[in-house]
C-alpha cells in the first residue's frame, strides 16, 4: 500500500503506508517488522508528523535504521507537500536485544551523545504529483490510490546528506537468526 493522498490536503489524517500484505503471509520468512505508518498534518503549524507501528524490533541492529528511514521519509513527504517535518512517534510491540549484541549495547550506553546532524535534501520539491492506481491483478487485491511526487522519481541517494555529522567509531554486530 502507499500514501493515499496529498499531505497538504485537509483530510491528510488518512495518509498511511502498510508493510503487511496478507497474500504474502504464507510465503514470507517473517511477517514485516514495521507494519504501519500514518502521517498527520498539523495545519496550524504546516507540519507533517508520522507515527510508526512496529511489530518487532531488533533494538541494536534494526531499530536505528527504522527510525532514520521513517524520519527521512517524513522529511521528504513534508518537502514535496510544502510542509515542515513535525514529530516522529514510534510504537514497538516487541523490542528485543539479542545476547550477541549486549557488549555493543553497553558500549553505546557508555558513549556521550554527539550533536545531532542536519539534513540536506536537494532535487526534491513540491512541483507536481502523479497518481498511480494499484488494482486487482487476478491474484492480489491492492486497490490503493498512491500519490507519487514527480520529484521523487529521479531521487538518488546523493540527493540526501547529513550535514555536520560527527559519529563515534562504528560498532558492528552479527544478525541474529
Name each model-derived stretch.
Residues 1-177:
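Terminal, non-catalytic protein-protein interaction segments that mediate quaternary/complex assembly
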Amino acid at each position: 500500500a502507499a500514501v493515499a493522498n496529498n499531505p497538504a490536503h485537509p483530510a491528510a489524517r488518512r495518509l498511511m503506508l502498510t508493510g503487511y500484505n496478507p497474500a504474502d503471509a504464507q510465503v514470507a520468512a517473517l511477517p514485516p517488522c514495521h507494519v504501519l505508518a500514518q502521517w498527520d498534518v498539523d495545519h496550524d503549524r504546516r507540519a507533517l508528523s508520522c507515527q510508526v507501528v512496529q511489530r518487532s524490533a531488533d533494538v541494536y541492529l534494526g531499530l536505528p535504521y527504522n527510525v532514520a528511514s521513517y524520519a527521512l521519509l517524513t522529511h521528504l513527504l513534508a518537502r514535496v507537500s510544502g510542509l515542515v517535518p513535525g514529530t516522529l512517534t514510534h510504537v514497538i510491540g516487541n523490542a528485543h536485544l539479542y545476547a550477541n549484541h549486549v557488549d555493543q549495547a553497553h558500549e553505546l550506553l557508555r558513549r556521550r551523545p554527539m550533536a545531532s546532524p542536519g539534513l540536506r535534501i536537494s532535487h526534491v520539491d513540491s512541483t507536481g504529483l502523479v497518481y498511480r492506481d494499484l488494482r486487482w491483478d487476478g491474484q492480489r487485491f491492492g486497490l490503493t490510490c498512491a500519490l507519487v511526487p514527480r520529484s521523487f522519481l529521479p531521487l538518488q541517494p546523493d540527493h540526501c546528506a547529513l550535514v555536520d555529522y560527527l559519529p563515534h567509531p562504528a560498532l558492528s554486530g552479527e544478525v541474529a537468526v
